[in-house]
Structure formats: structure tokens, C-alpha cells
Amino acid sequence: MTSASVATGPVLTHRSALLDRLIDFEIEPGAEFVVELLPAGYSLSAEWGSLPKSAQDSDNGIVLISVVVAPSELPPRPRLAMLPPFPIEEASDSNSFDDLRASILVDRTIGIILLRLGHWAVAIAENGELVVTKTGSRYVKNQHRKGGQSSNRFRRGREKWIRELFDQAGEVASSRFREYPGQIDNLVLGGDRVVLGRFLKRVKLPDGIGDRTLPNRLSVDQPGRKALDTAARDAWSYRIYELSNDN
């Protein structure tokens, strides 16, 4: 009887660091691995039951790495579970890291929109490198302490400021995305979930890019150039869970 595995994480790991780790696995003396790439809609076996709900049903699919243990009659032991930043298109099951490495290295171009009330940032990134950036702001007052008609006027004014912020960010994003000479594969969003939801309802982005929004929303304190640099890195990062035996 094998002992249960306990999952820890996730740790956000950039694809370059992940590629280095795959090399370490390959040169590990006497180790043999099973590498599974599972598209969305997968079902995990009991050995992976300690993974959190977010890993049990990822819209991008999941990568599972297990270690083959002796004697060979025993099932492979879970080692790593990875939530990829982009959707897994085709299932794979092998003793090689070749399919995983090929998936990691696929060329991609993404649009990025970071939005919080008062600030926005727009970018296009090719394989993790920013090639187009634009940032801006629009004043949106947060609080009003008086009641009555004054409060109603403030609320109407605030809604107007928010619409103007959305329109400003949407116009710039649409312009930059439309002018880009290549294909934008996906859209990545960062910022406040509610604000982003309202933004997408108001603004129609070109070429149906809004329909290709990736499920992982990026964490952003204040949209700007520094936040775009971080977003481009995080957009090509994997969420990795380590699994160890609970003895």
C-alpha cells in the first residue's frame, strides 16, 4: 500500500526556470518519470486528491509529473502538478519531457489590459517580451460622506468618471490591438475582477479578442509600466504544486 501524497503550493514559476528544472529531472540518476499533459475537462485519480479545487478543474488543463518507483508493479508516485498559463490543446502521456518542453516553447502573442479605478495599462507581448505599451489614468473619487441629494450627485458623477475611464482605456486598447500587424492569440487581464467585468461589458475589443481571454486574472496593485513588466512575466509562468509522501 502506498502512502498518501500531500500537495504544497502553488509557486508561480516562469517558463525559463521550469525549463531548467526539466533538465535537472533528466539528469537525476536512476530516475524515470511519467509526464501527462491533460486538456481541460480532465479527471484526476485518487493519488492527486490532495490538490486544491483550482487544480482539480483548471480551464487551461494540467500537467502531471510522476516518478516511477521500484518494484515496477507499484503505481508511479506523484511529484509535480502544474497549471499552465495557456490551454493544453492535445493530451499526452509519455516517459519523456519532449511534449511538455514543446508546449512550453510554443510562440505566442498576447494582449494585456490592467485596470483599476483611476489607472489603466495596455500592452502587447510576444513570447514574454513587451513590444507595445501604453499607460494612463482618469481621476475617480472613491468616497463621499454626505447623504441626500449631494450623495446622489456624487454617485452620478462617479459613474460618469468610471465610464470615461473605461472608454479611454478601451479606445487605446482597441487602437493598439487593431494596429498590431500580427495575430494576437489571447487576452490577459489584471486588476479588480468587478471593474474588469464592467469594463468588458462596456467596451467591444476588435477581432473577437475578448472571447480569447485567458482564465488566470493577474494580481495588480496599480496599473503602470512596472506592472506591465510583471504581468508579461507572470503571463508565461506556471503555478506549480509539489507533492510529497505523508509518512
Predicted ranges, named:
Residues 1-247:
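Terminal alpha-helical anchor/extension segments at protein ends
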